[in-house]
Amino acid sequence: MIWGSDSHNPSNNPAIAPPPGTHNASIYLVAGIAALGGLLVGYNTGVIAGAVLFIQKDFHLNPTQEEIAVSAGLMGAIIGALCVGPMNEALGRKRMLKILAVIFIAGSLATAVAPTYGFFLSCRIIVGFGFGATGSVVPVYLSEVAPANLRGRIVTFNQIAINFGIALSYWVNLAFAATGKGWRPMFAVAVIPSAVLFLGMFITPESPAWLASHGRWDAARRALERLGRKPVEIEQELNSIRWAGELKEKRAWRELLRPGLRLALVVAVGLAFFQQFIDPSP
């Protein structure tokens, strides 16, 4: 028997695979709330593009300082992306998104009232930590709450939200630039979706997979019920989660370097790197 073969995954067994179309509005509501994290990633990434012209005038920045102002958020994002993994596993997806929403609220407000250039940079690094971490947490959460037959569709909510957030930041920049109100309201606007994300996470369930991985099987069952799963689907998903946990224990990270997987790993990492390097975002 070869571990990892699709034939051993309960969700891939035709006899017990979830029937197509078995879902309701619950999963879309949860996905829509969580995708606000993606919107905040896009908005906080894009807003600096229009705001920096006004910031340069207010703080009398030279070209080097202007470049640092633009890149400060990305510096924080690198830190957030590197640090979020262990925190996400320890605290859970739902709690992490609440914490990140608070970071966005506080960071956006502080950025909007920044009295000095140095204070502004500090705030942008904090917000950058938030969107760097959120970019990792949201897709994991979406993939773990979605049923197998909808997983691809639900996970794309995050990328759609990121791009919409970038576009929204440009529209907001244009609106405030036209009214002559300057750069501060541009950053303050991010408080609104941040607050909605924070409040929305109180009505969403924790990831069933995360709960099960911490031995909280009854809580995982209740989470699946809240997500609208039928009793038979709940048993199927719990079996699939249990199977995945057993497989994880049998695998080691070094197996990614096996000849059969090495090329795929290099291609996947390379695509992710060059996607960001060439910046294809609008």
What are the roles of these predicted feature ranges?
Residues 1-282:
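Transmembrane-helix signature of 12-pass secondary carriers
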